[in-house]
Amino acid sequence: CSQSQISKIEKGMIYPSSILLYQLSERLGIDPNSIFALTQNKKLKYVENVKYVMRDCTKQKQYKELYEIVKQEKNQNNFQSTEDKQFLLWHEAIVIFMVNKSTKIALNLLNHALKLTLTNMDCLSEREIEIMQTMAIFHGENKEYEKSINILRRCLTNFNKLDFPRDKEIKLKIIFNLAKILGHTNQHEEAIKYNDIGIKLAINLNTLYLLGELYYGKGWNLLRLKQNNEEDVADIMKKALFIFELTEKEYLIKIIKENYFENQNKKKHP
């Protein structure tokens, strides 16, 4: 946290992120709950605040920070209800996979988390769908593509059965991952179909979440089809780059420039 950030927080110009609040409480050696009580989230319970921080870490891919929080919360035993225990196990699995690279242990933790509430595989809750999707992502990263695709299809079917889903971005993530894995298995036409569904959904939800990645995925899959319109691909890639620049995703900006735009320049100026 820079001095300029601290000054802005003191003047009320910006609000500190939940991750920063958590780290600040650790630095000061005080109960994080007392820090959260001073923020606008004071009505929320301690566990809900920590869960919010954990989700924030996951979304921002801050896995080492998440690892520290999981370790601390396991020792403190604040997560007592079945749902809270499930949430902690789920995020422990994420850090075990992302930080320790232990697929087997991570999948065992996810299975354990799922069994805490699972009653019917054909009627999953929103949380159970999220846990199943994490399983699919792990299998995909492990190049077990068919397993991953089957789980993601089940997740999508179950999500579509929910009457009042609280977080529609879960569906967006399922569609994105399904398109990604289908692309890896050379099922490019079906992958493009899901890219298009995802793009429409993101626009309908008024969110930039995964929109750039969906455009890039569509362009990537189109390039792998024998018949593709170069102008269409260029237009799609420009949209992806624009969104990556807008959302300051430096890693993805680098990838799209190296994998597409620099190659196009070489073709034009050999």
Language-model features and meaning:
Residues C1-K8:
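Short alpha-helical DNA-recognition segment
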Residues C57, I96-F97, M132, H139, ...:
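Residue at a conserved register position within TPR or TPR-like alpha-solenoid repeats
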